[in-house]
Design a protein with these regions (language model features):
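Conserved AMP-binding/adenylate-forming core of the ANL superfamily
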Residues: 28-59, 64-73, 77-81, 98-103, ...
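Conserved AMP-binding/adenylate-forming
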Residues: 293, 297-424, 431-434, 449
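Conserved AMP-binding A3 loop
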Residues: 38-42, 166-192
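Structural core segment of the AMP-binding/adenylate-forming
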Residues: 58, 85-146, 153, 468, ...
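Conserved C-terminal "lid"/linker of ANL adenylate-forming enzymes
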Residues: 435, 460-463, 468, 503-553
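AMP-binding/adenylate-forming catalytic core of the ANL superfamily
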Residues: 97, 114, 387, 392-393, ...
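Conserved AMP-binding/adenylation subdomain of ANL enzymes
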Residues: 189-206, 213-299, 308, 333
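Conserved pre-ATP/AMP-binding loop-to-beta segment of ANL
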Residues: 27, 151-170, 177, 200-206
Length: 553
């Protein structure tokens, strides 16, 4: 096996040929506890080529759309690489999508073929089944359904160009407006090269995959980049519940992980913070010994993640400042990645040596970032990006595509930020989330939520505007509220005291314009996106809270 050297690739076909040629005997994918069901780079190529030939025989050629609806698994990569390097277009669908969402994506994308896992097969509507030319079981690659009348000859594949479409990724984000993001071969291939320059990984590295592969973060950094550098990716057979994740970490001992903030925030709030708070000695040491206690706990934290982690990438949402402050003091090898589906995704990052709490860092290799339409008083402006990784547009939606580009061709991220004297970017909040104060002030709910989330017992929160007032919707941490073990009167009394505490702490810490008027307690977890961001639009006007339930009684 050759030693890893930078190799320029501008299509995923070239990436596929490069990885499977250079690392032939090296393991590419496998389950966390067995090689059975996994692939070396060589056997991976054989399988992908075989499945591609099957698609060709069923009349599926270049330009045809092929959907993948499955949880993460080794065969997900096989499906993807049997589609894209041969000129077809992949339509990944998030595994937690509803039957209606799947149907809408299939219809809008005009997909002809569907790879579906056995776990997700129950969410395929009869409408989709009737429309499909071909359906394939992703667990076994057996043909579930074929329509002989819909193809009359073999499909013709082609060698894709950098400008050709590789995938259309559907994302509704936190706004609820689903859109198909069209990414070219150049978009994704360039971001793979960006990853190499941002964080060099080699064939010796081990990835533990815990994010859905249908999400662009895991697709690019967790599937395409390992293909480029020859690393091995390990998969879990089920969603990463704590017990399974801990077991997998001990077995795999990963060097590389890609996660969302919620995972490390749960570890911090559920284990690390209570440990410090319960001991006066630890609390004193943490405050007075220049982070020594954090570094000691940080060593244990690293051991929890298998003991070999050298890159713990956090992306998809903003990391809680208090948690990041701890990780920084603990010298934990985390990195912050910033990006969007529309940018393939990585456009900004903060690595070892220049991380600072709350900053997304600097632009990544081959990407330009700047602030657009800057407010001269506050220094706030919208982050705009330019580079080979920026999408072609939204599928079948030229009006929306035009709206997200400036007149001189910069992509508008909708993130409002400021820059410090060193050029580092700090996000204040989303343009779409911003609330206009009574005197015209820009109120960013994310800044208020950062304060609320550090109050004892708070797991997550969002701040919404209702009738000109700011209302905090709060979800308690697990086991903080004993819903079924206390009388109704005692429960309401405890909640009232807790809400008063949240209001007091929050309003002492935020500006006059950002004062919260009331707190409501969620009875159920917030509904989230694939990267665990709360779907804010669901709670703008109402929410399943204790207060609403009380009104109905």
């Amino acid at each position: 096996m050759q030693r890893m050297r930078e190799k320029y690739v501008d299509t995923l076909a070239k990436l596929y040929d490069y990885g499977t040629t250079v690392y032939t005997k090296k393991q590419y994918t496998q389950w966390y506890d067995t090689k059975e069901g996994g692939y070396t780079f060589g056997s991976f190529k054989e399988k992908c080529d075989s499945i591609s030939k099957k698609l060709t025989q069923y009349g599926i050629g270049a330009g045809d759309k092929v959907a993948i609806f499955s949880q993460s698994m080794p065969n997900w990569s096989v499906a993807f690489f049997s589609i894209v390097p041969f000129g077809r277009i992949a339509i990944p669908i998030l595994p937690d999508s509803s039957e209606n969402e799947v149907t809408n994506i299939i219809n809008h994308s005009e997909s002809k073929v569907l790879f579906v896992s056995q776990r997700n097969a129950g969410k395929i509507s009869q409408e989709v089944k009737d429309k499909m030319t071909l359906m394939i079981d992703l667990d076994t690659f057996e043909v579930l359904k074929s329509d002989d009348e819909k193809f009359t000859c073999d499909g013709k594949t082609s060698v894709p160009t950098p400008e050709d479409i590789a995938t259309i990724i559907y994302t509704s984000g936190t706004t609820g407006n689903a859109k198909g993001v069209v990414l070219s071969h150049r978009n994704l291939a360039s971001n793979v090269i960006t990853c190499y320059h941002s964080c060099k990984r080699t064939h010796k590295d081990r990835w533990l995959s815990i994010l859905p592969m249908a999400h662009v973060l895991e697709m690019t950094l967790g599937m395409l980049y390992p293909m480029y550098c020859g690393a091995t990716v390990y998969y879990l057979p089920k969603p990463p519940a704590a017990s399974l994740l801990m077991k997998a970490l001990k077995i795999v001992k990963p060097t590389t992980m890609l996660t969302v903030p919620m995972i490390i925030e749960k570890v911090y709030k559920g284990s690390i913070l209570p440990t410090i708070q319960k001991s006066r000695t630890l609390t004193w040491m943490n405050k007075n010994m220049n982070g020594l206690m954090c570094r000691i706990i940080g060593m244990k934290l690293k051991a929890t993640f298998g003991g070999h982690v050298t890159f713990y990438g956090i992306g998809g949402a903003k990391l809680d400042p208090e948690v990041e402050g701890f990780l920084l003091k603990a010298k934990f090898p985390y990195a912050i990645g910033y990006g969007l589906t529309e940018t393939s995704p990585l456009i900004g990052y903060a690595m070892h040596g220049w991380r600072t709490v709350g900053s997304l860092g600097y632009p990544v290799y081959n990407v330009q970032l700047k602030l657009h339409d800057v407010n001269p008083e506050t220094g706030e402006g919208e982050i705009v990006a330019k580079g080979p990784n920026v999408m072609l547009g939204y599928y079948k939606d030229p009006k929306r595509t035009k709206s997200v580009f400036t007149e001189d061709g910069w992509f508008r991220t909708s993130d409002i930020a400021v820059q410090d004297e060193k050029g580092r970017f700090y996000i204040k909040g989303r343009n779409s989330n911003m609330i206009l104060g009574p005197s015209g002030e820009n109120i960013y709910p994310e800044e208020i939520e950062n304060v609320i989330n550090n109050v004892e017992g708070v797991g997550e929160s969002i701040v919404v505007e209702r009738d000109g007032r700011l209302v905090a919707l709060v979800a308690p941490t697990e086991n903080f509220i004993s819903w079924d073990k206390e009388s109704e009167d005692k429960l309401y009394e405890k909640l009232d005291n807790w809400k008063s505490k949240i209001l007091k702490i929050t309003n002492k810490s935020v500006s006059k314009a950002s004062q919260v008027s009331s707190v409501e307690v969620m009875k159920e977890p917030f509904e989230k996106t694939a990267t665990q961001k709360i779907r804010r639009f669901k709670y703008k006007h109402s929410a399943p809270t204790v207060e609403e339930e009380k009104k109905e009684k």
